[in-house]
């Protein structure tokens, strides 16, 4: 519950800022990628040109991982891979999982995350608060071991009808998301 209250307060703060520009949004997903550019002055003062950075903390999940989660799920919807009742499956150490869980919840999909045993309990609990089912997998096994979070995600994807495995580490949409948004 505390997480929901926090997210709502943060979104209210973001909306206050964005409404000053006469912009409004239909839902929290429309805030993803609409992060401000900040000019870097001090760290680039000895370099020619102007340099900017995106302030990713203004994404609802406070991370650039929101961009990839939304972009990959939107593309899967366009391709007909996701429909009502579909399940999203992903491997994560936390940030991407949080974003995938948040976007899945808001789009109405079930979310299953295979998480390394190195992930903090706080991150795991936050993902659970967003409705994700969590499979904690040992971190001290090779990636091709059936118990690894990679292999658990692959197995679940094969076993669960109407599921989509995002596979962020090998998905070209991961990189594309940062150019598109």
Question: Where on the chain are the PLM-derived regions?
Answer:
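PLP-dependent amino-acid enzyme catalytic core
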Residues: 6-181
